[in-house]
Amino acid sequence: MRKNPIRRLAALALCLAIAVSLTACGKTEPPVEATATPQPTATPVPTATPEMTAAPQPTAETPAETPAETPAEGDAITRYMETMTLREKVGQLFFVRPDALDPAQSPGEINSSETVGVKTLTEEMRSVLTAYPVGGVAIFGKNISDPETLRAFTSDLSGAVRVPMFLGVDEEGGLVARLANNAAFSLPKYESAAAVGASGDSAAAEDMGRTIGAYLAEYGFCVDFAPVADVYTNPANTVIGSRAFSTDAYTAAQMAGACARGLASQGVLPVYKHFPGHGDTAEDSHNGLAVTYKTHDELAACEWIPYSTNDLTGCAVMVGHIAAPNLTGDLTPASLSGTMITTYLRGELGFSGLVITDSMAMHGVTDAYSAGDAAVAALNAGVDVILMPEILSEAFDGVVAAVESGAVSEARLNESVYRVLQYKQLCGIFAP
């Protein structure tokens, strides 16, 4: 049964009131010097990097030790987890397209933006959910026709499994806005995050987040894959562009924090993206592996500023399919890298919240990994939620088999399940 939406909004707003701000309650950085914002400059691509090797295939030998909270013995979530089957636990780690629940669709059809999307929950889809009780569904433009159909769809999805689902959408404002850019919806539209950032007014960014969060909550969503926290510094970059708030790290951080605060005020979980930084890459991870050749110090001084200067309590972070060979020594995507997730995001930056991959159907992963191997590698790297695997059954069953064989420890599984349930409780959609 769905919780009262007002209670859900109030609960998350209260829990996140301390989150995501540079000026109010986040760590305060020195103000940016009053100089002109530099134009984007490309990072030179080296012809060879001596330490660089091909990305290793995932193995069971080096599971990440994620520095997260240990589930307290006897607490309500732990007691609830004791009643869950292995498949129910594994299901909490998967956030899928609704089309992945339609047995009539091929992987190509599921992951294409050109095919007709499912817009209602059918009995066949309910049967798939019985076998694959996923923890979340991400709605795309092709799954949206009109307001009433969408409300019915999100309501049906939420109650279709034992543990209510996260319902998420990409609603950044501007180019990427699945609801606002649909002509059937009379919703506020924004030119772009870049236009908001150029105003220099963080209140405008917070108002954008608040406005978007309000209408997302109205349509049953509790997760927004926003804000874009990337710093746009490479003019050759075609995937981020105006989706970023600024070419300046501190401005991007301030605006992303304000936008996230606005989303949270409406009971919508903000997801900062795309760690370790997609604004300086030349490649689009939809089409292949993106690579940043920056050093640790260069990333810390630019791309990581939105993560290090904002209080991310109660927020989620999306990790991209971006290799950082000068930090890892190879071309493993950050989404599958224990070094990037456990050592840097969780360790150095101190993030103990929900970590989500970017879509695992992107060529940045699928060109080198099977759906099952990618899911296992991500989990062992410290990821909590696997977003949109290329083939749900292969990824899901791959994780189940890995847990049964010990390739993924039960402790590693339980850690992420616990965190997912904590966040669902925070969102007001789950009560153990």
Language model features: what each stretch is:
Residues 163-209:
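Substrate-binding cleft of extracellular glycoside hydrolase catalytic domains
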